[in-house]
Amino acid sequence: MDQCIEIADEFLDEGIVTYVEDKNGKKQEYKAKDGKTDLKTVVLVNGNSASCSEILAGALKDNGCKLVGETTFGKGVIQSTAELKDGSALKLTIMQYFSPKGNAIQEKGITPDYEVKNPEGTETDKQLQKAESLF
């Protein structure tokens, strides 16, 4: 998570990057410091964008950055492993990530502003072309 926040610091004004919430509704916020770039930013995402990259994409989108590509993977939970006496283990979901505007990531992913598929086997990168057209 530290690396995610460090990257967010480069692009966002001071504020929430993400927050986690447990089953009881207890929230913990992760915030960026004031370090926003003045450069226009467009981010490419797809189904391989997961976990921390989704958190960053959600924070950027909620703060006005445009996303291009396909919906992200949808991995937005924190899990803990409990070892049992017989040597097996139990994995428990203990918290869920949300974007700054309260959008859940788990099983939904982050939807890009511009849905652009990039079919396998094509030489043209349609997602990159769309992103470039936004500058």
Q: What would you call each of these model-derived segments?
A:
Residues 1-8, 41, 53-57, 61, ...:
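Extracytoplasmic/secreted envelope proteins and their assembly/folding machinery
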Residues 1-51, 73-83, 95-98:
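Gly/Ser/Thr-rich loop/hinge elements
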Residues 65-75:
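Gly/Pro- and small hydrophobic-enriched strand-loop and loop-to-helix capping segments
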